[in-house]
Amino acid sequence: MYRLIMALLMFMFVASPGYSQSFRDNNNMLLGKVESDGTVRNANNMRLGKIFEDGTIRDSNNMRLGSIEKDGTIRDKNNMRLGTVSSDGTVRDNNNMRLGTISSDGTVRNNNNMRVGTASGINTRYAAVLFFFNLL
């Protein structure tokens, strides 16, 4: 459940009309994608849920999983703060500990600066959430 929330969170406010956006692990294996309407699918094209324009994230059964605020604050289904994604791509947990970064080219790095994956066509502020909060 936690991984699903994070996968959905990473795509908030980032779906662009006309194409889907993908995220891959360090071995370039497809982890999933988000469609232009906000629908999130895994690598097997199974629908995981949807991200809505207001920041609400729901699973495939329409259950609220969490949200992401416009300032980058990530919240769980009980509205508890999980962490943040800053405009420069830095990801921090709820205790303000730096977890890693995602660069403007989509490269995701952990706190030791090791590459952990990529996020193609995905807003860096939200893509980092998947890799650092492991909700998918």
Predicted regions and their residues:
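Long terminal segments
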Residues: Y2-L48, E53-G55, M63-R64, K70-L136
